[in-house]
């Protein structure tokens, strides 16, 4: 077993400083944020994907620290009812997947997302109670019309 940490706990520090602190604490692995609510304080996938030099520098910095990546974190809401927000979170996820491939990281942590309660929704809304019966219609919409189709498409 290895001890890891979600690297965003030190998002106010430069990557090198954060890695040094983690190493001094006995941490062996990190889960850096790559977008969404996790932010991109230490890893900006679009920058690393666009620049082989930046990617190489990141890998060298990580290797020099003695730490490894357990997973990449991208906790957004790609099914947000606001199409602009949904697209931004979707792009973060796509870039995180591409970066994981480049880094040889086989795990990404994310949120499935929270759609609205109908096509006209402006805000995410998740039903937590099975009654009244209208709530079951909302859940059916969220699962059958939004979440399942989104993730089936994303997986391809």
Labelled PLM ranges:
Residues 32-59, 113-119:
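Glycine-rich, proline-tolerant flexible connector loops at the mouths of alpha/beta enzymes
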Residues 17, 56-57, 61-64, 78-156:
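Active-site acidic/histidine proton-transfer and metal-coordination neighborhood
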Residues 16-38, 103-107:
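Catalytic domains of carbohydrate-active enzymes, especially glycoside hydrolases
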Residues 13:
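Residues that form or flank phosphate/diphosphate-binding pockets in enzymes
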Residues 51-73:
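Short hydrophobic interaction/assembly module
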Residues 1-4:
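Extreme N-terminal starter segment of soluble prokaryotic enzymes
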Residues 31, 71-73, 109:
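Conserved beta-strand positions in the central sheet of alpha/beta enzyme cores
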Residues 6-10, 33-37, 74-77, 113-115:
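Active-site beta-loop-alpha junctions enriched in small/polar residues
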